[in-house]
Each structure stands twice: as structure tokens, then as C-alpha cells.
Amino acid sequence: MPKLQLSVAMGDYDRTRALFDGTVQIDGVEPTYMLLSPEEMFFRAFRFRDFDICELSLSSYLVKHAGGNCPYIAIPVFLSRAFRHTAMYVRKDRIRRPEDLKGKRIGVPEYQLTANVWARSILADDHGVQPQDVTWVRGGIDQPGRAEKIELKLPDGVVMVNAPADTTISDLLDRGDIDGFMAPRAPSGAARSNPAIGWLFDDPTATAKDYYRRTGIFPIMHVLGVRKELAERHPWLPAALFKAFSLAKAAALDKLDDTSATKVTLPFVEEQLRAARQTMGPDYWSYGVADNLPTLEAFTRHHLSLVHI
């Protein structure tokens, strides 16, 4: 039987490298890999259905799936995960603690970004700051005029306004026109070096470790998707993808354990790996539903309460 010729869009990660360098093969598939930024992947996937297999925003996937119009079926391969305590920046000259954000203005590139759902969940669960307690200002991080990738309705009581058409939320933060900034990327331009701007949490790593110890949650950002018609026509394909992506991740972890030469352009990586395993266990970046059920349930709970379809 000839192999399926399929397009695969994903990020350039150590956990996917064994796939695109050919070390790991997808059974029954002859792939054409495209290494793209999340913004381009998600826009093309949800607007134009450009890819057969694609890394997807977990939040956008759930919005589209709940609306009955998602072209993809998710596979529990979680290509991006991150503690989003580093996703919140504030004017340190007026915000001393998370609770100070009540009544303030927070810039966001998009309301429904997965990173922002997790960040809002941290504010709500740990600090009592609800989405209705602030005014959300939507705009681009480094270019004006960014809009939501997918249509959504905000919950009752949530107020969001657009940034002026000629400015970015980074500029607004730098000038002090907003009090906070929530995004998966850091502020750009002058805001990046402004001494009055900093992380909401003074030590976000320590705060994230405490969060994990209390909740057992390692936030999921992106999931793997396959076009519905392909999965229906070839029911073996999702399992083949899960197997291949799991093998690629295992290859990346094996390389991290090889200390003969540093594989990552970052000092102290061995200590960071040891610390991650001590805190989170040996299989800290697990795939599959069963091992990630608490994380998925927590995200779904906040997603349903924060984003109305």
C-alpha cells in the first residue's frame, strides 16, 4: 500500500526534531514538514485548513470544536507546555501584587489565547482577580491592529476595548496607558527596557513550582490535530501519529541526558533538568489523556467560564 503524502505543520522543537530530520518515521505516511511560528500555523489552520496534520492552539481548538466547526481532531500530543506566570507584565510603579490589578487595564493580543486562559486562571484561583474585575485592551504586541483569529463571544460582565489603531499594547504599557500586559511573548520595543515594567511575580519560577506542588498542573498550550476526514478515512492514522511523536520526544529526552557535550545553548541545563525531575517526576512532559486529566479538566473549567461560544 502506498504511503499517504501529508503536510505536517509544527514548531521547531527538540521534541519534534527527530521527525523532521528523518530519525523517526510516521508509519504509513510520507510527510512534508513545515516549521512555522504558532501565529502563522494557527491562522492558516483555522481560517484556511491549510494542513493535513498541524500543531494547534488548545484554546482555539476547543472554541471551534464546541461550535461544531473544527476541521481537526485532536490527538493527545502536547507539543507546547509552559507555566504562564511569566506571561504577565505590569507597571511596577503602580502594581505591587496581583490583587492590585482589580479595576485596572490589561493589554492582550487576543482574549482567547491559551496562554491567557491559563494566566487568567492563575489570577482567579490564586488571587481572586476575576476577568470581570479588569478592562481588557486588545492590540498587537509589536504591530498595531491585531484581531482575534477566531470569532468568540465574551462572558457577561467582561469588558474589552481595542487599542488605538496606530499603537501596540507594548507602547501602551511603556507610556503607562495600561497597567498590565498578558501574552505568550514579552513586550517589545521601549517597553522591554523600561525599568518601571517587570513581571507581575518577582520570582515567577518559584511561584510556578509552588503552583505545581499545590495543583499537579503543568499547563498545556498546544495539541496535535489531524484533519477529520483523514482520520475517518484512515482510522489507524491517529495512533501512528501518537507513536511517532512519542518516539521523537523520547529521543529528545535521551539527548538531554547525554552530558558529553552540551546540546542546548544554555548554561546550567543539567541542573535545570535535575530540578524539573525532582519537582515533577521523570515523565514530566507526558502525552496521553490519562496522565494529563487534571490539567485538561482545569483548563476546560476555566475555558468554559471565560469564553462563551
Language model: regions and residue ranges:
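Secondary-structure end/capping motifs
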Residues: 225, 230-302
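Amphipathic alpha-helical segments that form well-ordered structural scaffolds
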Residues: 122-126, 172, 295-305
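Short, glycine-/small- and polar/acidic-enriched structural segments
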Residues: 7, 14-145
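Conserved small/polar residues in nucleotide/adenosyl-binding loops
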Residues: 307-309
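Pocket-lining segment of extracytoplasmic ligand-binding domains
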Residues: 146-257
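Basic/polar N-terminal segments that are highly enriched at the extreme N-terminus
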Residues: 1-4, 153
